[in-house]
Amino acid sequence: MKRIMLIGPSQCGKTSLTQCMRGEALHYQKTQAIVWSPTTIDTPGEYLENRCLYSALLASACEADIIALVLNADAPWSPFSPGFTGPMNRPVIGLVTKADLASPQRISLVESWLVQAGAQKVFFTSALENTGVDEMFIFLNAKESSCLTK
């Protein structure tokens, strides 16, 4: 499986998604620093929310195969600027988390924010209901993902 780096604001579900990907029981755990594993790089939301920490995200992106921009379906606004992932020089996917909490119109808006930020493919997930994760696994386990062939 490709190593995926999860970037998103605080409380958007990055760590829950990581726990779900590892088959662990879901429990709240505040990520205080970048957490490295063989298949994931989990980043604290503060690294996105504080521009002074962008350099840590850029440096860590070098160790990832794919960048995942994570945003909860009920997010009031996008923390990602258009073209946010350009300097990372990695394929980018978008992950809409907590998809069970929002209307289809709201999910569509969040999807458009992720695409503007650089996501080439967007997945809709719910760690609570364990939906959308299988599609993401299939994509990550593919020998050559479609967004890698641009």
Curated annotation (Swiss-Prot):
Localization: Bacterial microcompartment
Biotechnology: Can be used to target proteins to the BMC (tested with GFP).
Binding site for GTP: G8, P9, S10, Q11, C12, G13, K14, T15
Annotated segments matching region Targets protein to the BMC: 1-42
Top-level taxon in the UniProt lineage: Bacteria
Gene Ontology terms: cellular component: bacterial microcompartment
Family statement: Belongs to the EutP/PduV family.
Assembly: Interacts with PduU, probably via the PduU beta-barrel which is predicted by modeling to be on the exterior of the BMC.
The protein's role, per its UniProt record: May play a role in the spatial distribution of the bacterial microcompartment (BMC) dedicated to 1,2-PD degradation, perhaps being involved in cytoskeleton dynamics; might bind GTP. This subunit is directly targeted to the BMC. Expression of a cosmid containing the full 21-gene pdu operon in E.coli allows E.coli to grow on 1,2-propanediol (1,2-PD) with the appearance of bacterial microcompartments (BMC) in its cytoplasm.
Protein's name in the database: Propanediol utilization protein PduV
Organism: Citrobacter freundii
